[in-house]
Amino acid sequence: MLKINKAFHIKTTVFAIVGLLCSMFAVPQSVFAEETQYFPVASSRVGPYSAMGTGYYGAQIDYMNYVNMNGGVNGVMLTWQECETEYNAVKTVECYQRLLEKDGQKIVVFDTLGTPGAYAVINRMAEDNVVLAQYGYGRTDGADGRVWPWVFNAASH
């Protein structure tokens, strides 16, 4: 009887291991990969807007770090890349182009935090189907979704 139990336990263990190995190949690879969501940070820590920009962009990055420390958003970790615009329209366009994609993930929203940058990138963003987030600044016709469907005005003009 001892030999039967030992043989039974060995067979059960082998079948369990084989079953586990087979199930690992049946599960999509994305289950094992860490999911991420990429955010561009077009900052203005230097230049005429630096007094407000240093605190705003520092807080934005601190918040994303905080979210990641607590497991992300439903397990999705936040990634970002920062580019300094100096509150300059030409540099905002350069940053937009540089930040548009990272590791194969295209941005879904871009925040210029200023009218000069918003005017400079609005046409390109419409072509790229990227949302321009505006918070009470930018083009007044951006408040009308029929004119600029890719502009989201948080505070209407």
Protein language model annotation of sequence segments:
Residues 90, 104-157:
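Extracytoplasmic ligand/sensor domains, especially the bilobed periplasmic-binding protein
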Residues 18-31:
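C-terminal segment of classical bacterial N-terminal signal peptides
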Residues 81-82, 86-107:
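Short, well-structured alpha-helical segments in soluble
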Residues 1-10:
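N-terminal secretory signal peptides that target proteins for export/translocation
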Residues 37-61, 83-90, 113-116:
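Extracytoplasmic "Venus flytrap"
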Residues 73-86, 147-151:
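Short beta-strand elements in bilobed, periplasmic/extracellular small-molecule ligand-binding domains
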Residues 34, 58-80:
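Signal peptide-proximal N-terminal region
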Residues 39, 57-64, 93-97, 110, ...:
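Extracytoplasmic/secreted envelope proteins and their assembly/folding machinery
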